[in-house]
Amino acid sequence: MPNVVLSSRLTNNDSVFLQEWIKPSVRPYYLKNEKTKFWPEQRELVTDLLEHDIIESAFQTALNPAPQRFVRIVKFHRVNDYTVYATIRDSTALILCYFTVDCVLDYETINNDRITLNTLNTLFVIGNVTLQFWNHRECKLWFNQDFPGLRMVPVLKIEKARMFDRDQISSNVQFEWVYDTLHG
């Protein structure tokens, strides 16, 4: 009898909910803006989360998953006035982001924990995400990162975040920055 390999086993995902969405979402806006040399923010790159009870919301998301909503926090770069600057990833790519003051306060009130406490590699559901384009000086200041091949650096502004799975599963896979794939 021949071996059967399920399509879900062809890629090494650490969660069935964590799918590729960063590259396909960010790249078209970057390429369009690079041509026009105008860098407006893109609102609702990811739509808002439902305003239900946390358990109900997580359960609802599990039943009807939208792949663009799941991320893992890979690194915290800095915290300044309750704004948290971090690197997140989907199943294939890394991107810089920041969690707004309202997002952090909402998370910490609901979970009675700091957003930076034991959340590295934790699976989050995010919502109300805006794609912004930052200059190199801002990225160096807030993230201590530089991407010299880019004119502007895409950064995600996250206004809603809910912990979906508290397991801190790290991956042996080396993820690439979304910035390495943005050149035409």
Swiss-Prot record:
Protein keywords: Chromosome, Nucleus, Telomere
Role played: Component of the telomerase complex involved in telomere replication. Stimulates RNA/DNA heteroduplex unwinding which favors the telomere replication by the telomerase.
Short name of any one Pfam family annotated for the protein: TPP1
Subunit: Component of the telomerase complex.
Protein name, per record: Telomere replication protein EST3
GO molecular function: telomeric DNA binding
Any one cellular-component term (Gene Ontology): chromosome, telomeric region
InterPro entries to which the protein is assigned, alphabetical: TPP1/Est3
One GO biological process term: telomere maintenance via telomerase
Record-stated family: Belongs to the EST3 family.
Compartments, as annotated in UniProt: Nucleus; Chromosome, Telomere
Nucleus as UniProt keyword: yes
